[in-house]
């Protein structure tokens, strides 16, 4: 399938409403983003660079050309001119994260590279590029810095705990936006859902019988049936301890957005001529 290249798009057309509202509020705090870009961001960039070079496989056009080509393709579709650095680390759960703003680097697990097909990997990389495009990284790196080893002073710990709870709530919601960017990158909702099914725990020996309809049924059953007061309390308490939103929830939110027609509107509106 020939993918449409997207250009001059308004990222606010893509963002999840809750992510957009919180991010706009953070961006309006005077000097806050500038402060982060001059303090927390360089520290996290340096920390990640040292860790990635010292304990990971640096993926380049020379070292791993096929994987690097997936990243170049994702950047080309989304109009990201500066291709970020890419590292693979040994961990078999299919995960990824990114750090940096000016010096942006994506770190992807070896398991993701092994378990995902090419188009699935493009969705996965597009998700991380989405965090970068949307301006999430300074605030995400602030939250990540609060978990770093040097945060051991009691007064700093108390302050960081107050900041962590609302910031972690936004951190999870930012993934809903990044998933949208991911599917705009791979341009196939089934590819995005296959990634989520694999990450949700489908055994590798069942990959040849992935049932997307069954997963979507599970997702919508979860959203529609677990709505009692006790269920709501259990959901809230469970989510507070999670770094990321549940895969089933992410699938439901992404599919609802796709089915609403917003995905196609963005493709039609911002496709390169």
PLM regions: where:
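Divalent metal-coordination and catalytic microenvironments
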Residues: 71, 108, 127, 178, ...
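Short helix/loop segments within enzyme catalytic domains
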Residues: 62-66, 74, 78-80, 156-224
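Active-site His/Glu-centered metal-binding helix of metallohydrolases
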Residues: 116, 125-134, 177, 181
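Hydrophobic or amphipathic, alpha-helical segments that drive membrane association/targeting
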Residues: 1-102, 164-165, 171, 203-204, ...
């Amino acid at each position: 399938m020939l993918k449409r290249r997207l250009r001059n798009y308004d990222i606010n057309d893509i963002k999840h409403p809750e992510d957009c509202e919180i991010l706009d509020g953070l961006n309006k705090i005077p000097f806050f983003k500038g402060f982060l870009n001059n303090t927390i961001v360089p520290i996290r960039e340096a920390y990640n660079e040292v860790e990635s070079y010292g304990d990971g496989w640096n993926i380049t056009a020379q070292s791993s050309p096929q994987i690097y080509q997936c990243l170049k393709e994702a950047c080309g579709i989304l109009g990201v001119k500066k291709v970020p650095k890419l590292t693979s680390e040994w961990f078999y759960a299919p995960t990824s994260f990114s750090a940096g703003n000016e010096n942006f680097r994506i770190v992807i697990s070896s398991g993701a590279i092994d378990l995902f097909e090419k188009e699935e990997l493009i969705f996965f990389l597009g998700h991380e590029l989405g965090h970068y495009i949307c301006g999430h990284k300074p605030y995400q790196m602030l939250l990540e810095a609060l978990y770093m080893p040097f945060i051991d002073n009691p007064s700093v710990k108390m302050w960081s705990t107050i900041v962590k709870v609302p910031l972690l709530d936004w951190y999870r919601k930012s993934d809903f936006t990044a998933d949208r960017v991911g599917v705009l990158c791979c341009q196939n909702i089934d590819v995005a859902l296959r990634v989520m099914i694999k990450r949700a725990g489908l055994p590798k020996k069942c990959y040849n019988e992935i049932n997307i309809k069954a997963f979507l049924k599970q997702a919508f059953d979860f959203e529609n049936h677990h709505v009692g007061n006790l269920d709501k309390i259990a959901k809230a308490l469970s989510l507070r301890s999670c770094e990321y939103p549940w895969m089933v929830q992410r699938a439901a939110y992404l599919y609802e957005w796709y089915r609403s027609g917003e995905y196609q509107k963005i493709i039609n509106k911002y496709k390169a001529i």
